[in-house]
Amino acid sequence: MSGFKRPSPRAATSAAVVSCLGLAATLQPAHAYRPFDGTDAAVAKEGEMEVELQPAGASRQNGQTTLIAPDVVLNFGLSKQWEAVFEGKLETPLSPSGPSSLTSAGAFLKGVLREGSLQDKSGPSIATEFGVLFPETQGDSGFGASLLGIVSQRWDWGTIHLNAGTALTRDHHGDIFLGAIVEGPSKWKVRPVAEVFYEEEFTQSHTVSGLVGAIWQVSDDLSFDVGLRHAITGGHQVNEIRAGLTFGFPLRAGSSVGRNETSRK
């Protein structure tokens, strides 16, 4: 996405954390849920860190193939209802070749405004995410900002996450984003997932995107994901493959690992 991204693996040493943060700098919302562009209405538990990592992925647009490696999102649980999110990815053109660029970098705050089905309570879960978009190393050199609203509802048959957001892009254009994520039953070890979204960068271009994939929930603090995405951006086709993992660990002794919900499984 171009204004909101920015989906929770865990690192084991402070050196790994610093390395991931260095990687965290196109415009997109703070995606905090792999392998989607949107996110869910849940946050990391207080005192814990979640890491969303794509070791390698690829996209193809206008006859050019780009390696996306790595793509990193770090989620720090600040309190029961709030987390800090840092993200970024490295893009390297392969054909034709070109210099690598640090893109989609940003820093965000995400908060649960209403606890609901994702927190093992009744009704929808409602959250917001807002923050700053950092300049790209090879692209737009300005700063931007984004604001996103999220509503999630879980049933026995599956889960739906609705996203609506607005942004000021790095080149200072207005941007809106509307998306929906659908997941299979949370009790399934491997659940099918899908996402559709529409994004409009005013006076520039609009994007219609669809993704299908699967999430393998190994445990509460470890999952693997894969997704295939097809989009039309400014009249041009974009094809992308995503594969990664999400893991987590406590930043202090004695904490349990997971999100402030009944887990995504």
Segment roles from a protein language model:
Residues A30-K265:
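Transmembrane beta-barrel domains of Gram-negative outer membranes and organellar outer membranes
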Residues M1-P35, R252-K265:
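Cleavable N-terminal export/targeting peptides
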